[in-house]
Design a protein with these regions (language model features):
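Inter-motif core of Ras-like GTPase G domains
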Residues: 120-139
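G-domain G4 guanine-recognition motif of GTPases
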Residues: 137, 161-175, 192-203
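P-loop NTPase switch/communication element
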Residues: 74-90
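Switch II (G3) loop of P-loop NTPases
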Residues: 103-122
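Extreme N-terminal, non-catalytic leader segments
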Residues: 2-38
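Beta-strand-loop-alpha "switch" segments that mediate conformational coupling across diverse proteins
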Residues: 178-211
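Walker A/P-loop phosphate-binding motif and the immediately C-terminal alpha-helix
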Residues: 35-74, 106
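Inter-lobe coupling/hinge region of RecA-like P-loop helicase motors
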Residues: 203-226
Length: 237
């Protein structure tokens, strides 16, 4: 084990003992191995496909290298998703207590945080990752909170992007309207949007990513996350 790996283990262990997940996440970045990329998925409220996004980004990046999904959500949604499929996911899903064993030597770490972090927590989370993703539903009630969050993060010069999720199917224009409003408000936002589909709950129930469901109609939903993954790769270069 390298000195860097030993340092990483020590810092994770120490911060877990403090039982402060926000600062624990930030600490990972301090001693991460060269080339490791940390992507944090967080949201100011629940029900915005945060864990769905974490699971499918972990699936995407598992084709690029060793990927670990750190599930910090008290509901353990990502871990439960994986366990329902007998842990046959192409990535490793663990909580903070298991991270010491699995995180070293990873190429990608996807962090699924608790929902509703406050402004200070968001800033700390942003310091501890290479990219922060903020899923948001395409509705007017989500717009103002996202503008306020972006203002707070913009002051820290953090690398973050909003992601419009749960987008209704054509002919609805809600997804495009939300993207346009975010851009007008100065919020960096992904070009890719994630459409709403019954396939995601089915995948969660089966314990697999949506790409593994035997339904050709759902391939377009997986394509959304493939396109998102490609955007992220460009941002992390």
């Amino acid at each position: 084990m390298s000195t860097t790996d030993e340092n990483l283990i020590c810092i994770i262990t120490a911060f877990w003992q403090l039982v402060n997940t926000v600062f624990w996440y930030s600490a990972i970045a301090v001693y991460c191995t060269t080339g490791m990329k940390i992507i944090t998925v967080t949201g100011y409220k629940g029900g915005v496909a945060k864990s769905t996004t974490s699971v499918h980004l972990a699936t995407y990046f598992s084709d690029k290298g060793k990927t670990v999904l750190l599930d910090g959500d008290p509901n353990r949604t990502a871990i439960a998703w994986s366990e329902r499929g007998d842990n046959k996911m192409p990535f490793i899903a663990v909580d903070q207590r298991q991270a010491v064993k699995f995180v070293t030597g990873s190429d990608y770490i996807i962090i699924d945080t608790p929902a509703r972090p406050d402004s200070d927590d968001l800033k700390e989370l942003a310091k501890g990752c290479d990219l922060m993703i903020l899923p948001t539903a395409p509705d007017v009630l989500s717009l103002q909170p996202m503008l306020e969050i972006a203002k707070d993060l913009g002051a820290t010069k953090a690398n973050f992007r909003a992601l419009v999720t749960i987008v209704p199917p054509h002919p609805s224009t809600e997804g495009k309207q939300m993207r346009d409003e975010l851009e007008l408000g100065g919020v960096p936002v992904f070009k890719t949007t994630i459409r709403r589909t019954v396939g995601f709950p089915k995948a969660a129930l089966a314990g697999v990513p949506i790409r593994d469901l035997d339904d050709a109609r759902l391939r377009i939903a997986w394509a959304d996350y493939q396109n998102l993954g490609k955007e992220i790769e460009e941002l992390l270069k």
